Amino acid sequence: MTKVLVLYYSAYGHIEAMANAVAEGAREAGVTVDIKRVPELVPAEVAKASYYKVDQAAPIAKIEDLTNYDAIIVGTGTRFGRMGSQMANFLDQAGGLWAKGALHGKVGGAFTSSATQHGGQETTLFSIITNLLHFGMVVVGMNYGFAGQMKLDEVTGGAPYGATTITGGDGSRQPSANELAGARYQGRQIAETARKLHG
């Protein structure tokens, strides 16, 4: 059976919620889905003082896990217009897999969050997608079959490059129903593509 990994980093729970929605969508395609997160790099006392959400249910991923999946969907919050250092650090450890071509032909995708509408979501998606392309993966975005990314009657994330959410400057805004629907749509699209390519 086709296997999909939703790999994420979430400091405050927004990307965790998006990861769960991506996984729900992937499961709709009839594939096996695992959700894992990358290790935290921030010292525990700093994470506590900054109110990081440290009680996340997803297990910690190991770099060798990546070879076990037909599709890998990567999510992380935006940090100054690029992926967070926790995810970058994890992907930087994939040099051995890259050298062996171990990820060639796997399907990949990206999702993210930012504090504001113009807070670097697309550049962050591209920073993730660049890694996936270097790994030899087939990248699937969030196409315009998801009409929710065209909405003008509400503040909403979403781009053809991947699902996104807007958190607000203080992080109080949680992913909207429309943003979660976009995440589910992208998860399903990636899973269906992986199933077609890998059976």
Swiss-Prot record:
SUPFAM superfamilies: Flavoproteins (SSF52218). Transmembrane segments: none annotated. Keywords: Flavoprotein, FMN, NAD, NADP, Nucleotide-binding, Oxidoreductase. Its cofactor is FMN. Its EC number is 1.6.5.2. One of its GO terms (cellular component) is membrane. FMN binds at residues 10-15, 78-80, 113-119, 134. Binds 1 FMN per monomer. It comes from Bradyrhizobium diazoefficiens (strain JCM 10833 / BCRC 13528 / IAM 13628 / NBRC 14792 / USDA 110). It catalyses: a quinone + NADH + H(+) = a quinol + NAD(+); a quinone + NADPH + H(+) = a quinol + NADP(+). The keyword Cytoplasm does not apply. Residues 4-190 form the Flavodoxin-like domain. This is NAD(P)H dehydrogenase (quinone). PANTHER family: FLAVODOXIN-RELATED PROTEIN WRBA-RELATED, FLAVOPROTEIN-LIKE PROTEIN YCP4-RELATED. NAD(+) binds at residue 12. One of its GO terms (molecular function) is NADH:ubiquinone reductase (non-electrogenic) activity. PROSITE patterns: FLAVODOXIN_LIKE. InterPro entries: Flavodoxin/NO_synth, Flavoprotein-like_sf, Flavoprotein_WrbA-like, FMN_Rdtase-like_dom, NQO. Belongs to the WrbA family. The keyword NADP applies. Substrate binds at residue 98. It comes from the Bacteria.
